Amino acid sequence: MSQEEVVFEESKQGIKIVFWGATMAGKTTALSLFHAIKKREDPENVYNFLKLEDKATERTIGFDQATFGLGTGTGREFKYHLFTTPGQDRFKSMRKIVVNGLHGIIVVLDSESARWEENKTSLTELFEILEDKLLNGEVKLQIMLNKMDLPVGTRISAADVGRLMVEAGVSDKLRDTFASVHEVSCLEALQALKETWSSGNWNPKSRPQPVQRIIMPIQQVIRDILVAELSKN
């Protein structure tokens, strides 16, 4: 069994969450940042971290995956698995494989105005694959709007995401999913991590705002999944 097959088998136990978005939107960077933060704050609950990328272009060519533990207070080990999907057009079939069996999804939108069409195509494809599960609440959804460090005038804001969804044909479908749009900058979060760690002033209770913005949608989708699972019992 290959490493990729092992990862998929293990993800059947626990929570599976997928980062979805157009190529170069920031999916791998967001996952890498979260992994780095958890490794510093809670290393005992950080497991494998697998990256499959083209070294020349630094683009994901399969999927990225990281596994983390979640304390339950009962002594029972519980894991959540974070995946990214490859964004390039040629990997559409791979994206369908990666989202199989997921519990939650984080859509990463690229705020650069020039990437409007790529974002729209990505949203349309997502609903072609997961519409029923998103609409019935089986799959929980949060949205990251990345690259908010770009100059105003060259990027969109959270206020523009509604229009993007209308053009993608998913606005009405998303109305009842209770998804929040989180404005983030992976670049600013990375810079904040480097500065805080080099100064020795890292405090999990007062993380820099750019870092906290990356963590919030991940924590929210995990919380939504757990609440839904507990309500079944």
Task: Explain the meaning of each model-derived region.
Residues F34-H35, Q65-G69, S122-E131, A159-G169:
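Short, well-ordered amphipathic alpha-helices
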Residues Y47-R90:
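Switch I (G2) and immediately adjacent beta-strands of P-loop GTPase domains
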Residues L82-T84, I106-D110, Q142-N146:
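Conserved beta-strand segments of the P-loop GTPase G domain that flank and frequently precede/overlap
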Residues Q88, G101-L123, D149-I156:
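Conserved Switch II/interswitch segment of TRAFAC-class P-loop GTPases
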Residues L130-K140:
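A short helix->loop->beta-strand "cap" motif at the edges of active sites that frequently abuts
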